[in-house]
A protein has these predicted regions:
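Exposed, low-structure sequence patches enriched in small/polar residues
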Residues: 1-174
């Protein structure tokens, strides 16, 4: 290129952990942010079946935010443990496509519950992940998506043999 490409970045991160071992309660919280500025973009075009990639001088920026809260509570006498995580994500920025600068935005919210029960005769585990997301590209809003994944596992030991039964269910909106 006829110019010197450069990128600047500003990053922030905060984490807090809380432990109350006697009460079997644990939690953590994290927040991160990132902002990037660049004076160049990569323009990719396909000509005669070949990829042509060129640097173009153009100021662009992007922002990423991520927050997460997780907690866990155990019940030792009952051989039971619960936990749940909540994650929120936001991203926006610009990309260069076919000689045009196009803006984008993405948001998502994730809920991740978990249950574990472990009496002397078995181990039962449930894990879920439920994600709601929304995107827009070039000022056009795309369809919201609600995807989830759930798993259930049962394990039992009979004499010296572990028997395990697992089920996994996916739901993806395309």
């Amino acid at each position: 290129p006829t110019f010197m490409p450069h990128t600047n970045s500003l990053n922030f991160s905060f984490t807090h952990n809380y432990k109350r071992v006697v009460k079997e309660f644990f939690s953590n919280f994290s927040l991160s942010a990132n902002r990037m500025w660049s004076n160049s973009v990569m323009d990719m075009q396909i000509q005669n079946g070949n990829y042509l990639m060129t640097y173009v001088q153009h100021n662009t920026k992007s922002t990423n935010l991520n927050g997460r809260f997780w907690f866990s509570k155990g019940f030792y006498k009952h051989h039971f443990k619960t936990s749940c995580g909540i994650t929120a994500t936001y991203s926006d920025g610009e990309q260069y496509t076919g000689g045009k600068v196009l803006g984008y935005e993405y948001r998502s919210l994730t809920l991740s519950p978990s249950l574990t029960y472990s009496p002397s005769w078995a181990y039962i585990s449930y894990n879920g992940e439920f994600i709601m997301s929304k995107s827009s590209f070039d000022n056009a809003s795309l369809t919201s998506r609600f995807n989830w994944k759930q798993s259930l596992t049962l394990t039992s030991t009979i004499r010296k043999v572990d028997l395990s039964l697992s089920g996994l269910y996916y739901h993806n909106q395309l």
